[in-house]
Amino acid sequence: FAKKLNLPENHSYTRAALLGALAVKEAIFQANLKLDGDTGFISGTSVGGMDATETYFKDFSEGKTDNNRFIRAQHPGFTTEKIAEYFEVNGFVSTISTACSSGANAIMLGARMIKTGKLKRVIVGGTDCLTKFTLNGFNSLMILSNEQCKPFDENRKGLNLGEGAAYLVLE
């Protein structure tokens, strides 16, 4: 993903930030948007940079750590900040972290910001990556399915986790 964004090999983007940046890039392209100071960015995420936590734990176990990198990358807002930084969005930038509804809440907040005249346009959506933390959390609830996803089937056996990102431009 980093190559598609022309990032250096030693970049500090988490997987969630990379997924998000690619989705934002696509949204900007599809909207034929020219970013300016009137553009806001609201991003939803459940676990944000949790993949950085897993990397940190591995590094810690091997005796090679960078606490500052870990502290910055672990909070959900870091993902939003890295994406906004990449696209040079310097206006209103906010993170919504309300579990599975984060992206939907980002869209609702963006629409309200436009409706009330606080923003002319805003990029809204969400990003999350699959991590051991997330997988183990849902596994501990014993609600994961080992079968193919079939959400509307009355014989479904649980849920299937995934990762992804989606953003759109509201004006």
State where each predicted segment sits.
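Acyl-thioester C-C bond-transforming condensing/cleaving domain
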Residues: 29-38, 48-171
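Conserved active-site "lid/cap" helical segment
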Residues: 1-43, 49-50
